[in-house]
């Protein structure tokens, strides 16, 4: 499938996301698997110097950016950082001017803000999946994230 854009009727999209990093910090990658009906799209990318948490966030941001119209999206992630950030911490960070409960600046704030903006375009449900536990979508996203690491390493 060339483009998984979503239709104007709020198409249902299932999305699996993952991030990987060798060194943490070090070369990292992100991967996304999206399915809508019979259509499927995969994406990956990477950075030469990054962290695992940044790559986890980038996977979701890039997956949502690829949807050109508002959709109903179920995001499957093995990242507690992303899951808790979006379902527990985000509202308080925003209320405190992007500060934690300890009054420290939120780490990766520009990525959290970008993710918040993308989530606002869609109806999003969050699902946590255990990593490396046989979930086929998560395993594919993990493989894509590792492709992103290799691309960042220049291989």
UniProtKB/Swiss-Prot annotation:
It catalyses: Endonucleolytic cleavage to 5'-phosphomonoester. The keyword Metal-binding applies. Binds 1 Mg(2+) ion per subunit. May bind a second metal ion at a regulatory site, or after substrate binding. The keyword Nuclease applies. One of its GO terms (molecular function) is nucleic acid binding. Monomer. Mg(2+) 1 binds at residues 18, 56, 78. One of its GO terms (cellular component) is cytoplasm. Keywords: Cytoplasm, Endonuclease, Hydrolase, Magnesium, Metal-binding, Nuclease. Gene3D superfamilies: Ribonuclease H-like superfamily/Ribonuclease H (3.30.420.10). Its EC number is 3.1.26.4. Endonuclease that specifically degrades the RNA of RNA-DNA hybrids. Its cofactor is Mg(2+). It is found in: Cytoplasm. One of its GO terms (biological process) is DNA replication, removal of RNA primer. This is Ribonuclease H.
């Amino acid at each position: 499938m060339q483009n998984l854009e979503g239709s104007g009727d709020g198409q249902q999209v299932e999305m699996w996301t993952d991030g990987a990093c060798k060194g943490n910090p070090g070369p990292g990658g992100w991967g996304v698997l999206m399915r809508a009906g019979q259509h499927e799209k995969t994406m990956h990318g990477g950075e030469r110097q990054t962290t695992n948490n940044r790559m986890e966030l980038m996977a979701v941001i890039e997956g949502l950016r690829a949807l050109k119209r508002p959709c109903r999206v179920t995001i499957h992630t093995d990242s507690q950082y992303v899951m808790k950030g979006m379902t527990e911490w985000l509202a308080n960070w925003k209320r405190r001017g992007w500060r934690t409960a300890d009054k420290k600046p939120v780490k990766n704030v520009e990525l959290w803000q970008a993710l918040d903006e993308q989530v606002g375009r869609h109806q999003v449900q969050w699902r946590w999946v255990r990593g490396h536990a046989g979930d086929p979508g998560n395993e594919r996203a993990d493989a894509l994230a590792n492709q992103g690491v290799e691309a960042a390493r220049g291989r």
